[in-house]
Amino acid sequence: MKSKNKILAVTAFAMLSLMGCNIDPILTDSYSEDVAWSNVDNLRLNLNGFYSLIGGYYGSEVENDACTDILKMNGPRDSENLFVFGSAPITPAANPFNNWDNRHTWQLSCCRFLHNLAEHRGNFPESIANEAEAEARFFRALVNFDLAKRFGASFILHKELPVMGEKNHARCTPEECWDFIYEDLTFAAKYLPKRWDDATKDPWGEATHTGRVTQGAAWGMLARAMLYAQRWKDASDAALEVKKLGYALYKNPSRPDKGYGELFMNRRSARVDNNESIIECGYSYDDEMDYSFDYFYCPPSDGGYAEASPTEDLVSAYEMADGREFSWSDPTMKANPYVGREPRFYASILYNGAPWKGQTLYTYEGCNDGYALGGGTTCTGYYMRSE
């Protein structure tokens, strides 16, 4: 019994001793806040995480167009077809356009970044701190704009990082929402550069700034947001600021399409002189990585899955080369619907009889690339084109 009491006493003493110790292990699987905010390189790496918000618009969200009149999913049971034809009604619990949780999470992430930047602002030159704040505020405006246009401009709007445990936040008014988006984007337009200096390298020797948002991106996003807000003067003024920055169509006179198709095929690393791109999502291509677009949208004879196809509504929207509108009511146009169309048509649409990779593409029913039940081939007679 005495031995047992001694063991208990020693154990209790050891536990009390440990409670008095300052055990602060060094984490080896993540960086501390001090490291993340210690220099300009780390600051910009921290900002890189926000750019997935732009990439999302060029991923699966492209297929949201299949709920409109310009794109059609080829699989009969694809969710977009089920929603459009009412087989799967849209409800609060089943909404293909729902990004409420995602955008509110990003809203808080932006506020957290700005809060931490304010605490560590002294580590950076004022110009760098202003640039970083401008980038973060651009993305905060982007997610708030996304919430406003999908759910209405009255939601819980966090202008600062909320206090832990704080509840019952009031919803903002539409005026407060649009004013806040306006303030964030005008700040971004003021402090973002017109063009980033790609001579600046990251710690791995690569250019860090290709594809970063610019002054033009901020003005352009503001123009679009103010259209949704029905603030026509603000939208017009912002669009004029974009125009002043000297953006112009990308041109290559040596190509039949004058460079339109080439614009989307230039490697991001090529440093192409491109004055058309205002906001872009670049694809870091190398010889060991395939671009999934080729599989998901190319014709089956080319090894593709043909997940979605452009509709006749979209195809007919392309004009004739002389600027006239295309019309099936015109006997001449109807006789040769794919002759004499504008260059963008031939760079974007694969049609019956189109030349494609050294062969002629046929999309009529019964051929390899024609309509068939079950998906995997076109249901409209057309395919998207990306050379």
Give the label of every model feature segment.
Residues L227-R231, V242-K334:
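Polar, glycine-rich mid-to-C-terminal structural blocks
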Residues N275-E276, P331-E387:
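Flexible, polar/acidic helix-loop-strand segments at domain edges
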Residues C21-N64, Y318-R324, D330, A335:
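Membrane-proximal, proline-rich intrinsically disordered regions
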Residues L18-G20, N144:
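Bacterial Sec-type N-terminal signal peptides, specifically the leucine/valine-rich hydrophobic h-region
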Residues E160-P162, E166-Q230, S236-L263:
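Hydrophobic, small-residue-rich alpha-helical packing segments that form membrane-like cores
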Residues N39-G56, D78-G152, E166-D179, L185-R195, ...:
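Conserved, well-structured interaction surfaces
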Residues V10-S17:
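Bacterial N-terminal signal peptides
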Residues M1-A9:
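Bacterial N-terminal signal peptides that target proteins for export
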